[in-house]
Amino acid sequence: MKKLLGGLLSCILGGWLLTACTSDDDLQQILEGKGYVKLALNTNTGFQTKAVDEEEYKDLNNYTVQILKGGKVVEGMEWKYPEMPTEQIELTNGAYELKAFYGKDEAASRQSMYVEGKKTFNINSDKVTAEVTCKPVCGKVTVKFDSKMADYFNDYSITFQTKALGDMNISWTKNDTEPIYMKVEDKEMISATYNLIDKQGKQAKIGNKTYELSPLKHLIVNVVPAVSNGQIGISIEVDESTNDHEVDITIPSDWI
């Protein structure tokens, strides 16, 4: 009986020692002053309107991934997504930022949009996971000039300004059809100036109009001429939102 108990105690003690040694080994794998991070990347590129399909921005393989420290890319820590390490990455202790992006970072563009995600994380002799979701930094603007505009005006356009554009601007002319992707902050108020030339060549600018725009939002501006009371009606609609706006712009009565 004593031999049996002794054997059981030896097995239990041996198992405990094995467990303890395994745990110690795991801890010893993290060198002093260092830690590990595992990276994960997602995308959320769909505008709430679902009006168009930006498929290429959903493909993770198009993205560049970086780890930054103090605003600078850590040496050897930049990859295209297919080459991004799937195992844990060793880093010295400190504060870092995971950044992933695709596209050209421009204040406004008709050709493309810029999609980016950032996430800060800290290494403190431990193992962490840093996950980032990439989203467009821009809102989308579409202008729809009613066909009757040509009955009253030789030329017409809208000039937009945003914080990112600074002293510059971008215009939507009467023949434009492609949406403009504008880099904006959340609930930024963008400004619009309406430029009109009537059939007699008289010019007018209607400015000081502002509209709210956020990343992933789609602003649709409908411009319709009204042939009474010398007014042009401007209907502003935000897709999939109940916050529609109606704005009337008064111009001289002899224009119509």
Can you say where each PLM-predicted feature lies in the sequence?
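Sec-dependent bacterial lipoprotein signal peptides
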Residues: M1-A20
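Extracytoplasmic cysteine-anchoring/structural motifs
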Residues: C21-I256
